[in-house]
């Protein structure tokens, strides 16, 4: 048993380029094995399919093609991320063989119970999972057909990256708050809208597993919250940080680029008028990154209503149980 190491050059194999020029470099041991069995939990249009292989077992040489602010998407419909991953997958099949990869795909009926299991070819099981999800989940644009001046929702102490550790301000506000839970913002927000996130932000960091998250929060975000700029100017810097690469490879830390990719939800700031974080435990943490905050949700709504004037419309988003679980 071992973990995939995206920086272990000796255990990576380059399979070539797709017709669109996407390079594919994957875990050598997995790709050259007689049979690769991959077990996955399908949670949204963002996950499943070839993402398991072409992200989960890939290097930055491959990941850089599709992990971009305009490509990452959770939609069940036309998903550019998975279009690229599928093109890469076709190359993997061509080079490795279509019968050497066996996928077990699961779909949860709630945070604690498996509702459906599929097994077989990657493309087939993903299509089956997508078909079932489309039957049970409305498209976001079908849920509501109007836009609002104020959008408010709570953020749980949950992140797929915080298993066996704790949340930090970056995960709470950006990754979970604007990212995983911010999908409805794209649908219901006006360009002038005020978005209110309620979360008890505190000065709590797990620097062992997230060694450069605090650094990005305190040094990069005060200067810019433009994810395109951050991606362009900081990738090479962190790829050359041998101390952080060592932490990733040998000390169970996230790869130093993980936090850079985690800034992508900040693109929503260009789609709205203002973001306010309500009810932090320690507002100075938000000050250090340049985020606005107030003491309570009530205060945030009162402020936003004064700003937007008469006939202000307010939407409170009720997120599903998958994002509201407690332990």
PLM regions with names:
Residues 261-327:
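Extended hydrophobic packing segments that form well-structured cores
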Residues 171-274:
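C-terminal catalytic subdomain
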Residues 1-49:
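An acidic, phosphate/nucleotide-engaging active-site surface
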Residues 41-42, 51-103:
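Mobile "lid/hinge" segments at catalytic clefts and subdomain interfaces of large enzymes
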Residues 78-164:
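Membrane-embedded hairpin module used as a gating/binding unit in multi-pass transport
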């Amino acid at each position: 048993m071992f973990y995939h190491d995206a920086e272990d050059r000796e255990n990576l194999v380059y399979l070539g380029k797709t017709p669109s020029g996407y390079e594919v470099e994957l875990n050598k041991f997995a790709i050259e094995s007689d049979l690769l069995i991959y077990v996955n939990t399908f949670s949204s249009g963002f996950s499943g399919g070839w993402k398991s292989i072409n992200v989960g077992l890939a290097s930055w040489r491959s990941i850089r093609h599709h992990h971009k602010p305009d490509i990452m998407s959770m939609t069940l419909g036309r998903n550019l991320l998975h279009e690229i991953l599928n093109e890469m997958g076709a190359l993997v099949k061509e080079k490795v063989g279509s019968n050497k990869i066996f996928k077990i795909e699961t779909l949860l009926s709630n945070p604690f119970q498996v509702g459906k299991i599929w097994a077989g070819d990657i493309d087939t099981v993903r299509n089956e999972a997508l078909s079932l999800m489309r039957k049970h989940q409305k498209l976001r644009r079908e849920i509501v057909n109007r836009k609002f001046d104020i959008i408010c929702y709570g953020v749980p102490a949950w992140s797929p990256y915080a298993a066996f550790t704790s949340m930090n301000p970056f995960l709470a506000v950006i990754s979970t708050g604007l990212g995983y839970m911010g999908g409805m913002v794209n649908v219901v927000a006006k360009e002038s809208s005020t978005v209110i996130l309620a979360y008890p932000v505190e000065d709590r960091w797990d620097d062992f597993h997230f060694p450069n998250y605090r650094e990005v929060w305190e040094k990069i975000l005060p200067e810019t919250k433009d994810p395109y700029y951050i991606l362009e100017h900081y990738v090479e810097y962190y790829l050359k940080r041998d101390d952080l690469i060592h932490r990733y490879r040998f000390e169970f830390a996230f790869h130093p680029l993980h936090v850079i990719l985690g800034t992508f939800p900040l693109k929503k700031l260009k789609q709205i008028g203002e973001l306010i974080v309500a009810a932090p435990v320690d507002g100075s943490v938000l000050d250090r990154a340049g985020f606005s905050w107030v003491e309570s949700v009530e205060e945030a709504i009162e402020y936003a209503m004064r700003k937007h004037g008469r006939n202000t419309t307010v939407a409170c988003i009720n997120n599903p149980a998958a994002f509201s679980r407690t332990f």
